[in-house]
Swiss-Prot record:
Cofactors demanded by this protein: Mn(2+)
GO biological process: arginine catabolic process to ornithine; urea cycle
Name of the molecule in the record: Arginase
Co-factor binding comment: Binds 2 manganese ions per subunit.
EC nos: 3.5.3.1
The species this protein was found in: Brucella melitensis biotype 1 (strain ATCC 23456 / CCUG 17765 / NCTC 10094 / 16M)
GO terms, molecular function: arginase activity; manganese ion binding
Residues engaged in binding Mn(2+) 2: D123, H125, D226, D228
Catalytic activity: L-arginine + H2O = urea + L-ornithine
Gene name of this polypeptide: arcB
Residues bound to Mn(2+) 1: H96, D123, D127, D226
Length: 306
């Protein structure tokens, strides 16, 4: 398989600086070597730059860096569309705003192929705010609402060529949801498996249910993995830590199941903030998880000291 890694040094979607260093942190953690050691071809496409900014102002004055955020979304969407034509694109973040570009880009490509696009959202948060409902103004909390075609983005974010059907989005590991997001998600068919459901039923049963549906509908699956999906005890390098996240074992099980399914066609690695890391610990964990998704099994995975 030909893996293509593209750095998306976005930090305008979050209230803390540092995510722009994420792509190079993954490189320093050996992401390309990890891919090649599994027998895959790896091409590093470097880091993307945002499109030209244009003046934009929204009535919600809490919103931060709207022109710059939109410039990033435009550039990322085109890049994701281009790189999803062939091979396996891996998008290195950068904060989760980048998914407002990656998902629309790959969904546009899927629509041209006549295939349904599915998204597995591995995150502590639903990221289902609109420009009108966000109170923090941090636009990394808006991608899912945007790419599923919710109202409130018209005239600001780019028009979607192929909105994702909300029922084709599965959120796994959710444990922090704002009231406005909760009400908005309840009005859709987005599949939400929060940590209580994981505790009650186990992550394998819940994930298997979603993967069976993706397979039955001959879908393409994009995985968007946020550092804060993981418990901060194993992945501290994120500005939005929420206790009670996925364990190292749960996360690897998910990645191995995804590999076994053969359904995953693209991947986001997001919200890594090296400024908050401990000697590269989180970057190493994320690279290790990616390797499991690409085929590294327990029997041949080298032991790494984090």
């Amino acid at each position: 398989m030909h893996c293509k890694i593209l750095g998306l040094p976005v930090q305008e979607g979050t209230g803390r600086k540092g995510c722009n260093m994420g792509p190079d942190s993954y490189r320093a953690a050996g992401i390309a070597d990890a891919i090649r050691e599994l027998g895959h071809e790896c091409t590093d496409l470097g880091n993307l730059a945002p499109a030209a900014q244009r003046p934009l102002q929204h009535p919600n004055h809490a919103i931060k860096a709207l022109p710059y955020a939109v410039a990033w979304i435009e550039a990322i969407s085109e890049a994701a569309y281009r790189e999803s034509a062939e091979g396996f694109p891996i998008f290195l973040g950068g904060d989760h705003l980048l998914a407002a570009g990656t998902v629309p880009g790959i969904a546009r490509r899927a629509a041209e192929k006549g295939r349904k696009q599915f998204v597995l959202w591995l995150d502590a948060h639903t990221d289902f705010h609109t420009l009108e409902t966000t109170t923090s103004g941090n636009l990394h909390g808006t991608p899912v609402a945007y790419y599923t075609g919710q109202k409130g983005f018209e005239g600001y974010f780019p028009k979607l060529a192929a909105p994702i059907d909300p029922h084709n989005v599965c959120m796994l590991g959710i444990r922090s949801v704002d009231p406005a997001e909760r009400e908005a998600v309840k009005k859709t068919e987005v599949i939400v498996y929060d940590m209580r459901l994981i505790d009650e039923h186990g992550v394998a049963a819940l994930l298997r249910r979603f993967l069976e549906r993706v397979k039955a509908e001959d879908g393409l699956l994009h995985v968007s993995l946020d550092v804060d999906f993981l418990d901060p005890s194993i992945a501290p390098a994120v500005g939005t830590t929420v206790p009670g996240g996925a364990t190292f074992r749960e996360a690897h099980l998910i990645m191995e199941m995804l590999h076994d399914s053969g359904l995953v066609t693209s991947l986001d690695l997001v919200e890594l903030n090296p400024f908050l890391d401990e000697r590269g610990r989180t970057a190493a964990v994320m690279v290790d998880l990616m390797a499991s998704l690409l085929g590294r099994s327990v029997m041949d995975r080298p032991t790494i000291s984090y």
